[in-house]
């Protein structure tokens, strides 16, 4: 059995850990609101961007001059998985859930005879994926030094993806990230970026015909690269909010668990101390009776 001194040290250590997890929870809570507002503000723009492009693409998708970012290169053999995760841990299943979804998609494609490559955004995703797919990771972008995620960060990633597509390194690109729903709910999401999946009009919706100046193909040639950056930017903002939500929830659970451990350890300490005092009293009384 541990001595009383060892028990006191253990209780003090648990209390110190509880202070750290509580502080991390408060920091995550303070940053979550801003991150959530940024993610929610980006959603309407990204969704409207997709809707506009889908409308224009409806007329251009079948034309010979349709941009390759829209129509693709006609092949479906090499898939690039753009996996966006966080730079830090201590956030529950936030990072692992995104990686798990990407890993499942990779194994599914490989079982079909497809070639899979990875483009990692975020240190945690890279560290997990390289255990199984080290030779298949063709690029890795870390944002540890970025204090606040900006559109320029998404543009840089989009330019790298487009350059590799134009170089013929892959045929299809799918984005993986975590969509923020609430503090306790973040949804791992997969979204195809290249070729762009055109959303069909809802059932019962009357299709509207537009005339564009300049031609649809020319408009799309300018819009599609920007849309790619917009969708990546949205994913980064959703990830940021999801990270702080997951971290806040994880640290709250850790703080509660630490409190429960302290309660149990204190109870054991008090019982042990009481037993030692009782034993000493019995020895004193027995000695007095012997005299």
UniProtKB/Swiss-Prot annotation:
<keyword id="KW-0139">CF(1)</keyword>
<keyword id="KW-0375">Hydrogen ion transport</keyword>
<keyword id="KW-0997">Cell inner membrane</keyword>
<dbReference type="GO" id="GO:0046933">
    <property type="term" value="F:proton-transporting ATP synthase activity, rotational mechanism"/>
</dbReference>
<keyword id="KW-1003">Cell membrane</keyword>
<dbReference type="GO" id="GO:0005886">
    <property type="term" value="C:plasma membrane"/>
</dbReference>
<comment type="subunit">
    <text>F-type ATPases have 2 components, CF(1) - the catalytic core - and CF(0) - the membrane proton channel. CF(1) has five subunits: alpha(3), beta(3), gamma(1), delta(1), epsilon(1). CF(0) has three main subunits: a, b and c.</text>
</comment>
<keyword id="KW-0813">Transport</keyword>
<dbReference type="Pfam" id="PF00231">
    <property type="entry name" value="ATP-synt"/>
</dbReference>
<dbReference type="GO" id="GO:0042777">
    <property type="term" value="P:proton motive force-driven plasma membrane ATP synthesis"/>
</dbReference>
<dbReference type="InterPro" id="IPR000131">
    <property type="entry name" value="ATP_synth_F1_gsu"/>
</dbReference>
<keyword id="KW-0472">Membrane</keyword>
<keyword id="KW-0066">ATP synthesis</keyword>
<comment type="function">
    <text>Produces ATP from ADP in the presence of a proton gradient across the membrane. The gamma chain is believed to be important in regulating ATPase activity and the flow of protons through the CF(0) complex.</text>
</comment>
<dbReference type="GO" id="GO:0005524">
    <property type="term" value="F:ATP binding"/>
</dbReference>
<comment type="similarity">
    <text>Belongs to the ATPase gamma chain family.</text>
</comment>
<dbReference type="InterPro" id="IPR023632">
    <property type="entry name" value="ATP_synth_F1_gsu_CS"/>
</dbReference>
<dbReference type="GO" id="GO:0045259">
    <property type="term" value="C:proton-transporting ATP synthase complex"/>
</dbReference>
<protein>
    <recommendedName>
        <fullName>ATP synthase gamma chain</fullName>
    </recommendedName>
</protein>
<dbReference type="InterPro" id="IPR035968">
    <property type="entry name" value="ATP_synth_F1_ATPase_gsu"/>
</dbReference>
<keyword id="KW-0406">Ion transport</keyword>
């Amino acid at each position: 059995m541990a001595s009383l001194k060892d028990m006191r040290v253990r209780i003090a250590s648990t209390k110190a850990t509880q202070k750290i997890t509580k502080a991390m929870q408060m920091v995550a809570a303070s940053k979550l609101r801003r991150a959530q507002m940024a993610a929610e503000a980006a959603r309407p723009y990204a969704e409207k961007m997709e809707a506009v492009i889908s409308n224009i693409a409806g007329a251009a998708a079948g034309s010979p001059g349709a941009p390759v970012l829209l129509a693709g290169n006609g092949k479906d053999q090499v898939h690039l998985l753009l996996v966006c995760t966080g730079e830090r841990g201590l956030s529950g299943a936030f990072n692992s859930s995104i990686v798990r979804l990407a890993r499942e998609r990779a194994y599914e494609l490989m079982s079909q005879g497809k070639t899979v490559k990875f483009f990692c955004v975020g240190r945690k995703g890279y560290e997990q994926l390289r255990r199984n797919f080290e030779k298949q990771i063709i690029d890795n972008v870390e944002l540890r030094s970025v204090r606040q995620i900006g559109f320029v960060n998404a543009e840089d990633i989009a330019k790298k993806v487009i350059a590799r597509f134009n170089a013929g390194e892959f045929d299809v690109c799918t984005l993986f990230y975590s969509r923020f729903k609430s503090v306790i709910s973040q949804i791992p999401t997969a979204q195809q970026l290249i070729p762009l999946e055109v959303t069909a009009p809802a059932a019962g919706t009357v299709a509207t015909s537009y005339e564009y100046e300049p031609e649809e193909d020319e408009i799309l040639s300018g819009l599609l690269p920007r849309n790619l950056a917009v969708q990546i930017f949205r994913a980064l903002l959703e990830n940021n909010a999801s990270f702080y939500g997951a971290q806040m929830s994880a640290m709250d659970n850790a703080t509660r668990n630490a409190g429960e451990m302290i309660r149990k350890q204190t109870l054991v300490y008090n019982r042990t101390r009481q037993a030692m005092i009782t034993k000493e009293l019995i020895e004193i009384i027995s000695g007095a009776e012997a005299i």
